From Swiss-Prot:
Binds 1 Mg(2+) ion per subunit. Binds 1 thiamine pyrophosphate per subunit. The gene is iolD. It comes from Bacillus velezensis (strain DSM 23117 / BGSC 10A6 / LMG 26770 / FZB42). Involved in the cleavage of the C1-C2 bond of 3D-(3,5/4)-trihydroxycyclohexane-1,2-dione (THcHDO) to yield 5-deoxy-glucuronate (5DG). This is 3D-(3,5/4)-trihydroxycyclohexane-1,2-dione hydrolase. GO terms for cellular component: acetolactate synthase complex. Thiamine diphosphate binds at E66.
Length: 637
């Protein structure tokens, strides 16, 4: 063994984080940008002491909620295309438990983040300590075991020397494009402060090379043959295409060979919305244009996609009698889906090499791509100009609320603003290079269908876990990634109530974020779901005990935190608020009261959800029968 240096486990951890670098396409930079922390008795005297003594280049931010700060860390990594991360340090017990939802969010989205929850005593001398759970069947079980199912890598450190192999394994996982996800290292609180003679070589600069995985000649030949044999291929652009940086290759392939592009939520803004062959999002929350193309396709080229139920309309979006699949993915598991021909390789490299193998090919779509795009643009224009009337108004979500109920909402909330009109007003008003973020409720559907991003990587949707509360927290992560851009959280009142603690963190550190709050006084998306399937409007509206609609003054709440706030219930007020918000140096919140049922509906799509097989309600019985009928046309696996 060579020279050693005596450090506590926590001090060794911080030194190691400072020496991790990533190398992609000839560019080398530090991989760990900083650390979010909320100190408690499990980490303040270990990691807290180490950071105070020497944080190195790490930026340290004090979070306000463990889930919130972990979401901020995840959003930063996602926006940086998984090439930089923040670590997250929490105390033992409830602080660690609060990481669970955020870890699941990162895992579902394949986003690297380093989670460092403190753990109970390795010696067990003071057991049970404050915030420790006890199980009769095992003294080894702690709250942190709950993080195992939602971590790509999980370990518990009960000896200082264990840290070395554990960290190397964690960084191997986080820097692997095929496996990237949350790495959780639980460090016993007594071990954090325990000293050990660490080998100095452990702290040498360590470069993690992300070399682009090359396709084999067999894979390229097979892929090219399948494209040439098809007449109507469609490229499904997933998040992997964005992380690979495959924009130019996608455009070239699409333009040259007449292949339309359709997008997943994660893949949106890989290619600009105004690109002629980009038909927008597909599936349950997709455009009619994209869904028409998918329905006619005889080959689906999935580029970096997981084929979630929302992208495939629960496996009903395609004509499976004729459609074949070609999957390009760095993950072998993902490439195997839907009985596809698999190319397990980097998207950018593979698409670039395929381009030269398709000479003379042209799809049979002809003018259909332009026709579908024009048709959808006309529908988008209509949705941007919806106006409410107090008599005979037909909302986008039909046959749920009567005119009287809609009028009741208009009176209670003091608004006549439809959601789609508000959304497209925002799209037309904010700077084109702004980055927008959303996650849950009806807004992701509206955004995937309607939002035009004409600057790459400016559309940030967390729709793998669709975690309520990600929207505001994640906006802080966006601002850390893009300090010179305007960043906007598009969030419903339900998600805002679920979690918005990191708005205070943004204000504390003068990281300007803009919160655009759509308040329809309820869980509107799920209300649509229940009523679409035969149930009544049951506990999804925000109503008082005497059935009055809640009207919360969210602008006043944010004003109390120190944000610049606005109330905008008309298009004119919204435009004025957006323009003024651009001039502010402090975080802003624009509260919009919007009418329920004025979000977009589905376009030639279907979602398989559980419906009661037995019910006293005829409407539920009909919904169940309709579901069973639709399933007959769905692929079984």
């Amino acid at each position: 063994m060579g020279k050693t240096i005596r450090l506590t486990t926590a001090q060794a951890l911080i030194q190691f984080l400072n020496r991790q670098y990533i190398h992609v396409d000839g560019k080398e930079e530090p991989f760990v940008e900083g650390i979010f922390t909320i100190f408690g008795h499990g980490n303040v005297l270990g990691i807290g002491q180490a950071l105070e003594q020497d944080a190195g280049h790490l930026k340290v931010y004090q979070g306000k909620n463990e889930q919130g700060m972990a979401h901020a860390a995840m959003a930063y990594s996602k926006q940086m295309l998984r090439r930089k991360i923040y670590a997250v340090s929490t105390s033992v017990g409830p602080g660690a438990a609060n990481l669970t939802a955020a870890a699941g969010t990162a895992l579902a989205n394949h986003i690297p983040v380093l989670l460092l929850p403190a753990d109970t005593f390795a010696t067990r001398q003071p057991d049970p300590v404050l915030q420790q759970v006890e199980q009769e069947y095992s003294a080894a079980v702690t709250t942190n075991d709950a993080l195992k199912p939602v971590s790509r890598y999980w370990d518990r450190i009960t000896r200082p020397e264990q840290l070395m192999s554990s960290l190397i394994r964690a960084f191997e996982v986080m820097t692997d494009p095929a496996k990237a996800g949350p790495a959780t290292i639980c460090i016993s609180q007594d071990v954090e402060g325990e000293a050990f003679d660490f080998d100095e070589s452990f702290f040498e600069k360590r470069v993690h090379y992300i070399d682009r995985m090359q396709p084999s000649e067999r894979e390229l030949k097979g892929a090219a043959e399948r494209i040439k044999q098809s007449s109507r291929p469609v490229i499904l652009v997933g998040g992997g295409a964005k992380y690979s940086g495959a924009r130019e290759e996608l455009i070239a392939l699409s333009e040259t060979y007449g292949i339309p592009l359709v997008e997943t939520q994660a893949g949106k803004s890989t290619v600009e919305a105004d690109f002629a062959n980009n038909l927008g999002g597909m599936g349950i929350t997709g455009t009619l244009a994209a869904n028409k193309a998918a329905r006619q396709a005889d080959l689906i080229i999935g580029v970096g996609t997981r084929y979630t139920d929302f992208a495939t309309s629960s496996k009903t979006a395609f004509d499976f009698d004729k459609a074949k699949f070609l999957n390009i993915n760095v993950s072998r598991m993902q490439a195997y889906k839907l009985d596809a021909f698999q190319v397990v390789a980097d998207a950018k490299v593979t698409l670039g090499r395929l381009h030269g193998l398709l000479d003379g090919y042209k799809s049979a779509f002809g003018t259909a791509i332009k026709d579908w795009k024009d048709e959808w643009q006309a529908e988008r224009d209509r949705l941007g100009k919806v106006t409410f009337t107090r008599d005979a108004f037909e909302p986008e979500i039909k046959n749920h609320f009567s005119q009287d109920v809609l009028n009741e909402y208009a009176d209670a909330l003091g608004t006549e603003l439809p959601q789609t009109t508000a959304l497209l007003t925002i799209n037309d008003t904010i700077p084109e290079d702004s980055v927008v973020i959303s996650s849950a409720g009806s807004l992701p559907g509206d955004l995937q269908r309607l939002w035009h991003s004409n600057v790459p990587n400016t559309y940030h949707l967390e729709y793998g876990y669709s975690c309520m509360g990600y929207e505001v927290s994640g906006t802080l992560g966006l601002k850390l990634a893009h300090p010179d851009k305007e960043v906007y959280s598009l969030v419903g009142d339900g998600s805002f109530l679920m979690l918005h603690s990191e708005l205070i963190t943004a204000l504390q550190y003068n990281k300007k974020i803009n919160v655009l709050l759509f308040d329809n006084s309820g869980f509107g998306c799920i209300n649509n779901l229940q009523m679409d399937h035969g149930s009544g409007s049951y506990f999804c509206e925000f109503r008082t005990e005497d059935n009055q609609i809640l009207n919360v003054d969210y602008a006043k709440v944010a004003e109390g935190y120190g944000a610049k706030t606005y109330r905008a219930n008309t298009v004119e007020e919204l435009k004025a608020a957006l323009e003024d918000a651009k001039t502010q140096d402090v975080s802003t919140l624009i509260e919009m009261k919007v009418l329920p049922k004025t979000m977009t509906d589905g376009y030639d799509s279907w979602w398989h959800v559980g419906v009661a097989e037995v019910s006293e309600q005829k409407s539920v019985q009909r919904a169940y029968e309709a579901k069973e009928t639709k399933l007959k046309s769905a692929k079984q696996y």
